[in-house]
C-alpha cells in the first residue's frame, strides 16, 4: 500500500527535520505510528488499528542510519555506536525512538509515534467515548479534591493522553512534569517539563527521573506529574505525596488493573525494597488507580478504583 503525498491537512505539525520522504508518510491523516526496519521495511498504524506494510521510500540502510542520527540530534541527544539507542520528542507531539545497527540488530530501527490528540481536555475525551459522564465527574472530583492518581495501562492505551487531559483542567496551577521525553506539553503558562539526559561519551552528565523528581520538589509545584514510573523515581514521588505534595499523577505500564500491584512490587525490588513495603508506601500516597485499555480498536477507561 502507498500513500499519496497529501490527502488533506494532517492532524499534526510535521517538522522539516523529518525530510520529504518521512514527511509524506506522516502527512497522511490518522497515522499514529511509523516503524522503519532498515531501508526495506516500513510499517504504519492508524489510531489503535492494526499494523500495515508500506512501500519503502528509502534506498539504503545508510540513509536510514543518517536519518536516525539526524532525528535524535534534533531532539538534543546523540546516537552512535557508544550510545546505539535514544529516545526524543520533536515538533508538536512526535516521539522518536532509534536503535542504530549494532550487534543487537543488523539494521537501524526507527519507531515514530504521533500524538494526534495532544490538546484534548476531559470533556473532549468523553465525547470520543473514552469514558462516560460518571467517569468524567469522578475524574474532575479527583482533581478538585487534590487526590493523587496513577494511570495504568499497556503501551498505546492512552495513558499520556488521559494524564495530559486531566492536568489541562488546572490551567492556573504551576504543574511540573518529569519525563524521559517531553510528551505532556500543556499550553498553560505555569507548565514546566523537566526531561532526563543521557550520559555523554565519557559516561558523565546523566540526569535521571529520580533526580528530576527531587529537583521538581524544590521548584514550588502545585502539582507534580511523572510521565512514566518504572524505578527509583516511584519511591521519591510517593514519599513526596505522603508529605504534603498533593494532587500529583503518574503513569505506569501494566497489562490489567489487577496486575498494577505486582508491577509496583517489582519496582520495589529494583529499589532494594521489599515489595510489600513499597505497596504500603504507594497505598498511603495514591488515592486512585485509573486503568485504560483498548477495546474494539478504541481507547477506554476500563476501571477506576483504589490500588488492588
Predicted regions and their residues:
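P-loop NTP-binding catalytic core
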Residues: 43-45, 51-145
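Hydrophobic positions on the alpha1 helix immediately C-terminal to the Walker A/P-loop
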Residues: 162
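Walker A (P-loop) phosphate-binding loop of P-loop NTPases
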Residues: 156
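Hydrophobic anchor at the beta1->P-loop junction of P-loop NTPases
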Residues: 151-153
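Switch/coupling sub-region of P-loop NTPases
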Residues: 136, 149, 165-285, 291-295
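Conserved lysine of the Walker
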Residues: 159
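N-terminal anchoring/assembly modules that precede and organize ATP-driven motor systems
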Residues: 1-53
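Active-site phosphate-binding and catalytic loops of NTP-dependent enzymes
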Residues: 20-24, 71-87, 173, 271-276
Amino acid at each position: 500500500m502507498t500513500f499519496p503525498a497529501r490527502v488533506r491537512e494532517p492532524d499534526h505539525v510535521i517538522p522539516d527535520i523529518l525530510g520529504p520522504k518521512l514527511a509524506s508518510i506522516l502527512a497522511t491523516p490518522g497515522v499514529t505510528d511509523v516503524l522503519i526496519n532498515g531501508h526495506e521495511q516500513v510499517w504504519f498504524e492508524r489510531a489503535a488499528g492494526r499494523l500495515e506494510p508500506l512501500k519503502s521510500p528509502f534506498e539504503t540502510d545508510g540513509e536510514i542510519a543518517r536519518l536516525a542520527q539526524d532525528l535524535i540530534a534534533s531532539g538534543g541527544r546523540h546516537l552512535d555506536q557508544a550510545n546505539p539507542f535514544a529516545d526524543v520528542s520533536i515538533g508538536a507531539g512526535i516521539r522518536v525512538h532509534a536503535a542504530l545497527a549494532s550487534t543487537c540488530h543488523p539494521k537501524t530501527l526507527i519507531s515514530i509515534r504521533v500524538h494526534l490528540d495532544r490538546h484534548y481536555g476531559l470533556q473532549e475525551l468523553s465525547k470520543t467515548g473514552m469514558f462516560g459522564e460518571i467517569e468524567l465527574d469522578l475524574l474532575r472530583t479527583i482533581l478538585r479534591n487534590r487526590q493523587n492518581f496513577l494511570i495504568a495501562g499497556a503501551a498505546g492505551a492512552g495513558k499520556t493522553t488521559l494524564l495530559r487531559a486531566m492536568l489541562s483542567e488546572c490551567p492556573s496551577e504551576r504543574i511540573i512534569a518529569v519525563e524521559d521525553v517531553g510528551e505532556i506539553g500543556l499550553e498553560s503558562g505555569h507548565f514546566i517539563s523537566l526531561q532526563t539526559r543521557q550520559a555523554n561519551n565519557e559516561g558523565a552528565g546523566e540526569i535521571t527521573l529520580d533526580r528530576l523528581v527531587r529537583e521538581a520538589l524544590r521548584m514550588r509545584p502545585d502539582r507534580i506529574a511523572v510521565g512514566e514510573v518504572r524505578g527509583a523515581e516511584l519511591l521519591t514521588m510517593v514519599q513526596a505525596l505522603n508529605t504534603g505534595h498533593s494532587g500529583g499523577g503518574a503513569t505506569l505500564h501494566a497489562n490489567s488493573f489487577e496486575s498494577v500491584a505486582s508491577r509496583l512490587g517489582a519496582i520495589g525490588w529494583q529499589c532494594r525494597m521489599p515489595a510489600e513495603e513499597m505497596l504500603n508506601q504507594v497505598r498511603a500516597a495514591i488515592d486512585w488507580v485509573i486503568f485504560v485499555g483498548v477495546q474494539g480498536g478504541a481507547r477506554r477507561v476500563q476501571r477506576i478504583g483504589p490500588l488492588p
